[in-house]
Amino acid sequence: MPSIKVRENEPFDIALRRFRRTCDRAGVITDVRKKEFYEKPTWVNKRMKAAAVKRTHKEMAKNRVHRKRMY
């Protein structure tokens, strides 16, 4: 769990903002959301495969050469 030291005469809002930023950098929120519900291993594999397919389709679309018709 990330922690911060509140500086002297520091407003609460700024300290809270620094704490949230450190939590975001540490990946606490994404980890909690990922572990909020149990996900079966088959669902994890299915999600990973779908992400890989999406990634390859995106790379192929990026590298595709658009040819103009000459007629």
Swiss-Prot record:
InterPro entries: Ribosomal_bS21, Ribosomal_bS21_sf. GO terms for biological process: translation. Coiled coil: none annotated. The keyword Ribosomal protein applies. One of its GO terms (molecular function) is structural constituent of ribosome. The keyword rRNA-binding does not apply. It holds the Pfam family Ribosomal_S21. Keywords: Ribonucleoprotein, Ribosomal protein. One of its GO terms (cellular component) is ribonucleoprotein complex. Belongs to the bacterial ribosomal protein bS21 family. HAMAP family: Ribosomal_bS21. This is Small ribosomal subunit protein bS21. It comes from Ruthia magnifica subsp. Calyptogena magnifica.
